[in-house]
Amino acid sequence: MADAPSGPSVLSHYPGAGLAGEQQREEERHKGCHHHQLNGLISPDLRHLKAVSSLKNKLLEQKTRKDSGLVQPQGRTDTRAPNGLERLQGEEEKLSACLASCSLRGDGEALGNHVSQGENDDTIRYVRYESELQMADIMRLITRDLSEPYSIYTYRYFIHNWPQLCFLAMVGEECVGAIVCKLDMHKKMFRRGYIAMLAVDSKYRRKGIGTHLVKKAIYAMVEGDCDEVVLETEITNKSALKLYENLGFVRDKRLFRYYLNGVDALRLKLWLR
């Protein structure tokens, strides 16, 4: 088995490949979020996400009350207070304005695709996964520096079930970065996003590609009503730890001998609510 590279481009690993990965995930008991309040430590680029989530929840609650007839309109006078429908419309406008000002998307930028300028005039495009034709590029990029290979079924499990949470960084026709995630219910209590794989080509590191991919994935998770985002990464992977902690992730748990190469993992977590 190959040793883990000293400077891996893979910044997070799918835990199912580790010796104790799945077992530790099942045995883990959920810890209350009050033990890890962010207290403003979340990255300024992502801080608005908590406000968006809160506003979105409030909007959904008001819509549910309106649909069930619990919100009664006020009398129609010039000095009347806004009725339920008007308040709902006001919240929708506020949410739209908040989303429009989101730092993850520039003016006119779609969630799936956008372009940024890298060093040496390399134009970096960020695109959402669209077809099976992109699978080979993702596998090549992620497998290149992995100490333990994944089967194609592992990639398909994530990408086919959550294609909206897979993004690629492209320079011309070359894939230079990729992120693969999922979003589902955790213990029937809340919606948890999971970053399974993140990789950046060694020639294109230190250009913010990894950070950009993580931001796009997190924003897509927020649109799917995500409550928290978690991932595991090797405890020796200093560049990955720095990237995630700069975005507001905190160290939640140490997993001993988590990977097949015997290296410990750190579970990182970001609360969005």
Curated annotation (Swiss-Prot):
Gene3D superfamilies per UniProt: 3.40.630.30
Annotated localization: Cytoplasm; Nucleus
Signal sequence annotation: none
Substrates-to-products reaction catalysed: N-terminal L-methionyl-L-leucyl-[protein] + acetyl-CoA = N-terminal N(alpha)-acetyl-L-methionyl-L-leucyl-[protein] + CoA + H(+); N-terminal L-methionyl-L-isoleucyl-[protein] + acetyl-CoA = N-terminal N(alpha)-acetyl-L-methionyl-L-isoleucyl-[protein] + CoA + H(+); N-terminal L-methionyl-L-phenylalanyl-[protein] + acetyl-CoA = N-terminal N(alpha)-acetyl-L-methionyl-L-phenylalanyl-[protein] + CoA + H(+); N-terminal L-methionyl-L-tryptophyl-[protein] + acetyl-CoA = N-terminal N(alpha)-acetyl-L-methionyl-L-tryptophyl-[protein] + CoA + H(+)
Domain N-acetyltransferase as annotated: residue spans: 125-273
Keywords of the record: Acyltransferase, Cytoplasm, Nucleus, Transferase
Predominant place of localization: cytoplasm
GO cellular component assignments: cytoplasm; NatC complex; nucleus
GO molecular function, one term: protein N-terminal-methionine acetyltransferase activity
Superkingdom of source: Eukaryota
Subunit structure: Component of the N-terminal acetyltransferase C (NatC) complex.
Family: Belongs to the acetyltransferase family. MAK3 subfamily.
Protein name per UniProt: N-alpha-acetyltransferase 30
The organism's taxonomic lineage, starting at the top: Eukaryota, Metazoa, Chordata, Craniata, Vertebrata
